[in-house]
Amino acid sequence: MSPIDITAIQSHVAQHRDDIITFLREICAIPSMDSQIGPVGERVQAEMTKMGFDEVWFDSMGNTVGRIGNGPRVLVYDSHIDTVGIGDPDEWRWDPFQGKIEDGVFYARGACDEKGSTPGMVYGLAIARRLGLLDGWAAYYFGNMEEWCDGIAPHAFVEHEGIRPDFVVIGEPTKMLVYRGHKGRVEMKVVAKGKSAHAASNHLGDNAIYKVLPVIEGVSRLEPELGDHSFLGHGKITVTDMAVETPSLNAVPNGCTVYIDRRVTFGESVEGVIEQVRQLIPAANRERGDVTVEMLFYDEPSYTGFVFPVDKYFPAWALEESHPLVQAGQAARALTGLPDAAPGKWNFSTNGIYWAGKAGIPSIGFGPG
């Protein structure tokens, strides 16, 4: 591999500056909500082809993949290109897909989370190859779906495409710092079963909503008891949704499901966090079995019809600050002239829960926003 010449890199970037900006605006203009990433994936593939990638394709799940080189060492640049929805369009002050530039900042749906990292990855890899920086490497751009189930895309990529990287760079926003980990997550549900009756004769029913109230109250008070870690921080727990089964608005509900998001730090096991919630269920309900808790399971088909079933457990992970990949990220960042800063962490979840948390592949984050 050639020595890094930051001046040469900057010269190439300057030559492509307008194309990079246009590319970003165009991929943000293509809606990719609800994991529908086919059209934006095609646009990304067109740019990779233009920039001389050796191979571009859609994997079985429908994620976009581009490869440069075929060396023995494997590097993956990970950027999810799906987004959440836009909510009520009337509440936007500008078209979220057209976007706007204000004070040198580009605003659009997905500009930060996380389409903003894709142009830098695509052009960065192409420029690195031109400068001889990827000799001995197979380098991949991986534009994937992540919003609805973190880590499922890379998990399927490794198992079904047979590509297991040696190192991963995740493009989630890091404020242009190097990030080296984050808390994990467990999604669970508490299900209560009751008996319906007409509200005028509610004494004949068994209200399922009332059965989950002790759990909701308990969750609201549980956080001080959760685990803590000097780098990753304190565990978190939140009731995020509730679904009620009832014949009508004038009937006693016969079913109620409460959904819980539990952020886990090091030292907290999936079995332990589920048991914490189970202990919030009144003993009488636990004994009768009419209120239960279980981890969620994801088996929704992707837009291609591909199904990859996984439990919704996402482990915490962190690389040591002294790890060679973290140090390489810090060194690369220093070459750009950015102010010195210690490596940080995300306060949300990323595909790192699979790359590093489940597969044990050294991973770092670096991205705009």
Label every PLM stretch briefly.
Residues 1-4, 8, 189-369:
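Metal-dependent amide/peptide-bond hydrolase catalytic core
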Residues 2-107, 130-135:
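Acidic/His- and Gly-rich active-site-bordering loop/insert found
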Residues 27, 31, 172, 212, ...:
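Residue-level signal for inorganic ion chemistry
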Residues 68-70, 79, 183, 194, ...:
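A generic beta-sheet turn/junction motif
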Residues 88-102, 180-191, 331:
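Acidic-glycine-rich active-site phosphate/pyrophosphate-binding loop
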Residues 116-221, 230:
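Fold-level recognition of mixed alpha/beta catalytic cores in primary-metabolism enzymes, strongest
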